[in-house]
A protein has these predicted regions:
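Active-site anion-handling motifs in enzyme catalytic cores
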Residues: 1-145
């Protein structure tokens, strides 16, 4: 299947053990490798907020899955989701084992609606650059116009 799993660093050994036949993406590798691996996936399941953000930066759908190895109240996930207008949800509601080998179109419409920003990331970048408290190079501004 073309589903990538991006675990939080603490989850990595557990995910490698529990999903030996899955594409597990280690965010600790060289960034170019990570980006290539993410871009080769139909979608991402992630226990890491960074995994979700990087996937979204490249237009790859991603779903937060909360597993028992990481303590979080979900606040940082909800903060990010609110910033890109993804409806807030509890990552513990979804089971990695039940989703990992489904194609994107086999997922419920509810799940699919949670997997990509509803607000343009480029628009957010523009807004941030517009109010930056420092000079931004024109070449950077040109990339988000």
């Amino acid at each position: 299947c073309k589903v990538g799993i991006i675990p939080h660093l603490r989850d990595l050994p557990h995910i490698l053990r529990d999903f030996p036949n899955s594409k597990v993406i280690n965010l600790g590798k060289k960034i170019e490798e990570v980006i290539d691996e993410i871009n080769s996936c139909e979608y991402i399941l992630s226990t890491s907020l960074h995994g979700i953000i990087v996937a979204h930066a490249y237009g790859i759908p991603a779903l937060w899955i909360k597993r028992g190895y990481i303590f979080t109240d979900g606040l940082k996930f909800n903060d990010y989701f609110a910033s890109v207008e993804i409806p807030l949800y509890d990552g513990s509601k979804y089971n990695l084992e039940d989703i990992v080998c489904k194609s994107f179109h086999e997922l419920s419409s509810e799940i699919r609606s949670l997997m990509l920003p509803h607000k343009s990331v480029i628009e957010l970048q523009r807004d941030l650059l517009r109010v930056a408290p420092f000079e931004v190079k024109q070449s950077i501004l040109d990339k988000v116009q």
